[in-house]
UniProtKB/Swiss-Prot annotation:
Its main location: membrane. GO terms for molecular function: NADH dehydrogenase activity; oxidoreductase activity, acting on NAD(P)H, quinone or similar compound as acceptor; quinone binding. Its EC number is 7.1.1.-. It is found in: Cell inner membrane. GO terms for biological process: aerobic respiration. Belongs to the complex I subunit 1 family. This is NADH-quinone oxidoreductase subunit H.
Amino acid sequence: MDQLFASIHATGQSLLGYYWPLVWNLVKIIAVVAPLMGAVAYLTLWERKVIGWMHVRHGPNRTGPAGLLQPIADGVKLLLKEIVVPAKSSKALFVIAPIMTIMPALAAWAVIPFGPETVLADVNAGLLFVMAITSLEVYGVIVAGWASNSKYAFLGAMRASAQMISYEIAMGFVLVIILMVTGSMNLTTIVNTQNTGRFAEMGLTFLSWNWLPLLPMFFIYIISGTAELNRHPFDVVEGESEIVAGHMVEYSGMSFAMFFLAEYANMWLISIMATLMFLGGWTSPIDMAPFTWVPGWIWLGLKTLMVVTMFIWFRASFPRYRYDQIMRLGWKVFIPLTLVYLLIVAIWMKTPWNIWN
């Protein structure tokens, strides 16, 4: 594979000369964004199928074989729908808000590694970059609610922004703990450090991953990620019985769809981040045949799909929280817990039982 890429790079350099680096970067961006958009589209089908199975029904099964063309039909339908801009809205901000929401969700994938050498930008501060870029999404939500000139949209935006900012703090402390135990913010290095230790030497790699010693932080990260996404059971932002679609209530057509594209792209992002930080990334759970025969990118995909399916399971199983319960959970439970565990890990690393040496 490396020889193939080297050959392509040399051929492109000889043909395009000075412009080749720009063209090559565009090719790499398309190679990440195009499959991501396909994964986002088919995640909607997977969600409807899984919830259908949990409800003892089939889910979408009429459009194409086994309903496989349903996401394409939904996309065509949304493309053909009219985008209505409310008469008394702030038109420029109303149009920009969906773009402000989806751009950070896509930009964060620049530093996500899909293998030991497969990453768009292998930066040393990858963990910090993801946290910083995803924090910008709250601005799109606030702008959408304010520009719509609707009390329901504005209330939904205020709820969303407060909820997202609150749970970002707990997620931030979890990332600090990951930084402490791995000694790096580079996501590739974080994966590699989980493939060492006594259990890894025995071939039981899955016991050397961070999920075991940092199990409470793994759960806090997943639950905080659910709240960050404004998904059930933390979806009071768009509670059907209260404020309908929240900050998206005045949107239609593709502008409405862009908010959902951002949500599902973030579902994949949070899931793959959980896989990289806690579940060993692309490494095999058992370092022996036949597990080692499976390519690393398949292991990465399977683990990420497992975490994504957890989000869907939450939606199908749990009742919605009240807004005050959501804020209490974030501020009075998760933030103190992460601070205490931060101290515990710091002391643990100074003892002879430090497992991260």
